[in-house]
Amino acid sequence: MRWCLFALWVFGVATVVTAAEEPHHDAAPQTDNEVDLTEDDKRAWSSLHSGWAKRAWQDMSSAWGKRAWQDLNSAWGKRGWQDLNSAWGKRAWQDLNSAWGKRGWQDLNSAWGKRDDDEAMEKKSWQDLNSVWGKRAWQDLNSAWGKRAWQDLNSAWGKRGWNDISSVWGKRAWQDLNSAWGKRAWQDMSSAWGKRAPEKWAAFHGSWGKRSSIEPDYEEIDAVEQLVPYQQAPNEEHIDAPEKKAWSALHGTWGKRPVKPMFNNEHSATTNEA
């Protein structure tokens, strides 16, 4: 820093000497825009430049530059973090470990851990509780719900009880009901519909079935009616074949009777003429 100031002083002295040795010329006429700077103004500007120029920034760098960051580093830098480490770092976690760490978990274990299982709330207390809900208590309850109780209930719902109920709903009762709905009842009903009463069926067959063994030939009847008038037919024929009369009467409505009225009309005409 001192060498820089000395160089500036030498440079200023040299410029002053050279300016004194140069011959003075007439000054050119100044315009309105030009400013005449005196020596005092130049010196003031150079003095101001020493505060804001690059050299002054270097002077300020002692507070803001790397050196100042190193100074702050004692609080925030690596060294400061190591200092804070006494509370938050590994050492402090080890200190907190007495409450929450492995050691503390062992201490808490006295209430919830394995050590308590070896004491009042462990297997011994479970065995004590087991006297009510465990195997022994289940055996005690077994008198009502276990196998023994099921055998007792068996008298009503078991095999024995089913045999007793079987008198109503079992095989015996079904045989008793069989008298109404079984084979016997069907045989009784068979007298009306079954095979046991063939004579009744023959009588019933007379209404719907074939009463006579020889079927009448209705074509021959039509031929006879066309050739011989119905009134001139012998009485024996009317008596022997009563179904012919009914068929002829029915035939007049549905059958082929367009030829028969012609003979009847001629016969009626001859009878009228006679």
Swiss-Prot record:
The keyword Ligase does not apply. Its main location: secreted. GO terms for molecular function: hormone activity. Residues 1-19 form the signal peptide. Coiled coil: none annotated. The keyword Transmembrane helix does not apply. GO terms for cellular component: extracellular space. The modification Tryptophan amide is found at W76, W100, W145, W157, W181. Keywords: Amidation, Cleavage on pair of basic residues, Hormone, Secreted, Signal. One of its GO terms (biological process) is instar larval development. Transmembrane segments: none annotated. It is found in: Secreted. It comes from the Eukaryota. Residues 20-67, 77-91, 101-136, 146-148, 158-172, 182-274 form a propeptide. PANTHER family: REPETIN (PTHR14054:SF14). Inhibits ecdysteroid biosynthesis in the prothoracic gland of fifth instar larvae, with maximum inhibition during the spinning stage. When administered to day 8 fifth instar larvae it produces a significant delay in the commencement spinning behavior. This is Prothoracicostatic peptide. It comes from Bombyx mori (Silk moth).
